[in-house]
C-alpha cells in the first residue's frame, strides 16, 4: 500500500510541458484551419483554466482570439474581473466586457427561485453570448474545462460545457497548475481557489468537499486501471477515505451523459 500523495507525484511529474504546449498549439491551428474559421472566442473569468486558455490562444491567434469577460456583478468578485482584464492587457487580446446581471435578472423575474438552477443559468447565458460572437465573427469556441472537472461533470451542461474545441481537457487540475506556471501564467492565478462563480462565495473544492489532489488521484486510477473498483483502490492506496473515493467514482459514473451527445432513438419505423 502507498499513500495517495505518491501516486499524485507520478501524475504531476511531467517533464515535457514544452511538447504539450506545442501539441496544443498545433491542435488549435489545425482545428481552426479544418473548420475554415477565422479565429477563436472564449469566456475569460480570471481563473486558472480560462487564463491558461487565454495564454495559448493569444500565442496562436493574436488579435484573432476574442476574450469575453462576463461577470454578474451581483455575485462575481471584482477581483476576478480585475485579474481577467489584467491578463487581457498583458497579452494584448481583443476583448469585450459584458455584465450579465441585467440579462440574468430578466430571466429570473419570470422563473421560480432556485439558487442552483439560477446559478447554472448564469453559465448558460455566458454560453449564449460566446456563441453569438462565434456566429458573428465565424470563430470557433474554445472550452476551458480541465480533465478533472470534465470527468466528474463539474460544469454546466450547455453552459461552460459548450465548446467546439477543448484544448486543456487532457490535463488534470494538478497538472494544469504546473503547465500554467510553465507557460507564464502569474502565480496569483495559479494558486487561486477555483470558483465557477455561479453564486456568491462559490468555490469548487468547498462545494465538492474533496481536494483536487485527491480527486485527480482517484480519477487517474479510474482512467488507467483495467478494472477499477473502490475496494481495489482502498487495498492499494491510503490517505483518501472510502466515502471520498465512492463520491468521486459516483460523480464520474453519474455525469457520463454530460460527456456524450444526446441519446438517439433507435429505429422508429419498424421492419419494412
Regions found by a protein language model. Give the residues of each.
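ATP/NTP-dependent adenylation/nucleotidyl-transfer catalytic domains that generate, transfer
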Residues: 2-40, 56-59, 63-66, 73-80, ...
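Catalytic nucleophile loop
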Residues: 50
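Catalytic-core regions of hydrolytic enzymes
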Residues: 124
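Short, charge-patterned binding micro-sites
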Residues: 53
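Conserved G/P- and acidic residue-centered "switch" motifs that form tight phosphate/ATP-binding loops
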Residues: 47
Amino acid at each position: 500500500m502507498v499513500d495517495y500523495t505518491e501516486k499524485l507525484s507520478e501524475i504531476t511529474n511531467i517533464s515535457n510541458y514544452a511538447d504539450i504546449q506545442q501539441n496544443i498549439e498545433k491542435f488549435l491551428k489545425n482545428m481552426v484551419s479544418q473548420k475554415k474559421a477565422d479565429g477563436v472566442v472564449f469566456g475569460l473569468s480570471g481563473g486558472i483554466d480560462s487564463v491558461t486558455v487565454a495564454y495559448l490562444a493569444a500565442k496562436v491567434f493574436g488579435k484573432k482570439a476574442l476574450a469575453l469577460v462576463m461577470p454578474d456583478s451581483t455575485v462575481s468578485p471584482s477581483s476576478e474581473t480585475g485579474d481577467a482584464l489584467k491578463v487581457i492587457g498583458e497579452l494584448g487580446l481583443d476583448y469585450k466586457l459584458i455584465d450579465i446581471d441585467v440579462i440574468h435578472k430578466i430571466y429570473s423575474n419570470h422563473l421560480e427561485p432556485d439558487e442552483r438552477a439560477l446559478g447554472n443559468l448564469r453559465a448558460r447565458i455566458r454560453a449564449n453570448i460566446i456563441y453569438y460572437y462565434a456566429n458573428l465573427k465565424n470563430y470557433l469556441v474554445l472550452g476551458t474545462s480541465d480533465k478533472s472537472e470534465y470527468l466528474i461533470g463539474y460544469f454546466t451542461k450547455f453552459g461552460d460545457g459548450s465548446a467546439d474545441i477543448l484544448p486543456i481537457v487532457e490535463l488534470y487540475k494538478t497538472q494544469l497548475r504546473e503547465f500554467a506556471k510553465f507557460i507564464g501564467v502569474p502565480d496569483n492565478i495559479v494558486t487561486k481557489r477555483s470558483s465557477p462563480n455561479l453564486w456568491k462565495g462559490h468555490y469548487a473544492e468547498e462545494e465538492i468537499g474533496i481536494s483536487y489532489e485527491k480527486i485527480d488521484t482517484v480519477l487517474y486510477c479510474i482512467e488507467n486501471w483495467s478494472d477499477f473498483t473502490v475496494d481495489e483502490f482502498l487495498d492499494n492506496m491510503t490517505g483518501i477515505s472510502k466515502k471520498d473515493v465512492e463520491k468521486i467514482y459516483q460523480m464520474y459514473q453519474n455525469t457520463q451523459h454530460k460527456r456524450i451527445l444526446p441519446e438517439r432513438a433507435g429505429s422508429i419505423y419498424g421492419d419494412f
